[in-house]
Regions:
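Non-heme Fe(II)-dependent double-stranded beta-helix
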Residues: 1-14, 19-116
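Catalytic core of non-heme Fe(II) oxygenases with the double-stranded beta-helix
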Residues: 100-152
Length: 152
């Protein structure tokens, strides 16, 4: 089973998958530095579902984020589930800092739109830093994409 086949299987069963090293270390460093600059210039404080620094519309702020839109290892996974109606809704950043605490578990899909048979949206998360006890990590509930619940 190749990477794409395994990722598709994990998405169907668990609702998420992990693709390692989608960008190389130098690109991740450049994206991180650019994101820090964008956060300083354009970021806002968000407390919705937990404290964090939020930066909206990243591709408009810097071309380095364009690769997140159509990366050849990521886009085919989205296309598999969302064709022919694939639309980029947003490309934003949620920067969790030491002391920001946990974000509450939630679905990004409004409850009235939840559909366990056909996905109506998918998110990609681009981790530019390693997880650590200070900043934590993204929490997921395996299988919750089939639960029909707005907050697993």
């Amino acid at each position: 089973m190749n990477e794409q086949e395994q990722a598709l299987q994990e998405l169907k069963i668990y609702g998420f998958t992990i693709l390692k090293s989608v960008v190389d270390a130098d690109t991740a460093d450049a994206m991180r530095e650019t994101l820090i600059r964008c956060a300083e210039e354009h970021g806002t404080e968000h407390t919705h579902r937990g404290a964090a620094r939020h930066v909206s519309n990243l591709p408009v702020l810097d071309r380095i984020f364009h690769q997140c839109i159509d990366h050849p290892r990521v886009l085919p996974l989205l296309e598999h589930f969302l064709q022919p109606s694939l639309i980029l809704g947003s490309l934003n950043s949620r920067i969790v800092r030491p002391g920001d605490g946990y974000q509450g578990l939630h679905s990004d899909i409004p409850v009235y739109m939840l559909n366990m048979d056909t996905p109506v949206m998918m998110n990609t998360v681009w981790m530019l830093d390693d997880f650590s006890p200070e900043i934590g990590g993204t929490r997921v509930v395996p299988g919750s994409h089939k639960s029909g619940l707005g907050a697993p």
